[in-house]
Amino acid sequence: MNPLALTIFLLSLAIGTTITLSSFHWLLAWIGLEINTLAIIPLMTKTPHPRAIEAATKYFLTQAAASALVLFSSLISAWQTGEWSINSLMDLPMNILSIALMMKLGLAPLHFWIPEVLQGISLPTGLILSTWQKIAPMALLLQTSHLINLNLTIALGLTSIMVGGWGGIGQTQLRKIMAFSSIGHLGWIIVILKFDPQLSLLNFVLYIIMTAAMFMSLTTISATKMLEISTSWSKTPALTTTTMLILLSLAGLPPLTGFTPKLLITLELVKQNATLLAVMVMFISLLALFFYIRLTYVVTLTLSPNTPNSLLTWRTASRSYSTTAIMNTMALILLPITPTLLLL
């Protein structure tokens, strides 16, 4: 792709998200979401492959339907209250808006587009889709968290955690595994949204850090299938080791970063007398833990047959991977500074 065109599309992504984050008017928020949607489609079709075209089409249709629902809910709200303010929503438009934003995020049972879209695009575009594209809808959900229906968030959150774990078990494609991982993590974020929006925000930030680190590692290794990542040990042992630890962090095992949100959410649910919900969330999450540990086993504990000559790979001038190293570090060792993060 032309570097100038790429710069314009990336700037459009940044501008769209910024407009949505800084808006108090529903029309401006909707415009920001639309700019975001339209800016990423050329990035998806950067490689003219039928799978990429199919992924971009599915993404556009889903996001267009969700944007129509956002506009519909804001029109109903303006008709009922006479205001276009984001915080002046009645029950019906709030429920419609919640469903629309959760469709944009890819929460179950509105998750049908995420695995197929991620499978059809490149890893760098998948990184943008899994992290940056979720900021604007999540910001709108956080702004309206005091109005959102508690039963709706709990139902969709539990469904997402279950679908995220169940769907990832039989997968061998790493992008689909990351798609179901994203669905599961967003389920955790939505479950706690009504109880403690600040904790949802912390969980979302940590989700972005861990997901970005995983996508950057996969991009560096150039792995899109489980077979490819299982043979990467002989080429990049250090990066493969950190990739294994990031997988365990995504699974939520202590003492890694991913344990932080799960611990805090469980404690908050118990504090809010929702102990049964906390137990259900933890038990359902064991499904996701299974496929994370399975992938970890494939990455580190299985070595493909290779001769000593295969270890001597041709080495060109090495590129700097400082950003990947920084993200990997943050995805692993943020647990000790959690009290500091909570005070920010």
Curated annotation (Swiss-Prot):
Chief subcellular location: mitochondrion
Keywords, comma-separated and alphabetical: Electron transport, Membrane, Mitochondrion, Mitochondrion inner membrane, NAD, Respiratory chain, Translocase, Transmembrane, Transmembrane helix, Transport, Ubiquinone
Gene Ontology MF terms: NADH dehydrogenase (ubiquinone) activity
Catalytic activity: a ubiquinone + NADH + 5 H(+)(in) = a ubiquinol + NAD(+) + 4 H(+)(out)
InterPro entries for this protein: Complex_I_Subunit_2 (IPR050175), NADH_DH_su2_C (IPR010933), NADH_UbQ_OxRdtase_chain2 (IPR003917), ND/Mrp_TM (IPR001750)
Family according to the record: Belongs to the complex I subunit 2 family.
Protein name as it appears in the record: NADH-ubiquinone oxidoreductase chain 2
Native organism: Aquarana catesbeiana
